[in-house]
Amino acid sequence: MIAGTLPPPPVAGLMQFDLVSADPGRAVFSCRPDESAYNPIGAVHGGLVCALLDSVLGCALHSTLPQGRGYTSVEIKVNYLKAVRLSSGLLTATGTVVKSGTRVAFTEGVVTDASNATVATASSTLLVFDL
C-alpha cells in the first residue's frame, strides 16, 4: 500500500485511516476523527479507536507474512486511557508484533494524540492461516 501498488481497504476510507509507515513487524497509521465519529456524550466513539488499533495491529502482522498467508483477529483487548475529541487532533496508532508463530500471533499497540498523550493501548491475538 505504501508503494501504491495495492489500494487501501475500503474501511480505511470510511474511518479516515491513513497508513503512515510499515516495516517488518511494525506499522503506523494516522486518523483525524471528526464529529461524525462522536458518541452521545460528545467524545469519539471507542469503536473507532478499537478499529484503528485492530487495523494497525493486523497490518504489523501482515508485514511479516509471506505471500499466500493471511490472518484474522481472534481477540483484542483495548485500554482507553483518555477521551478523544476534536481537540485531540491527529491520532497516531503504532502496532508491533510481539511473537508470530505458524498459527497464532501476538501484537501490541498504542494510540497517541497530537500532544503525544497516550489515549489507548491494546493487545491482540491473531490466527494465521493459508489463503
Model regions and ranges:
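Terminal targeting signals and extreme-terminal segments of soluble enzymes
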Residues: M1-L131
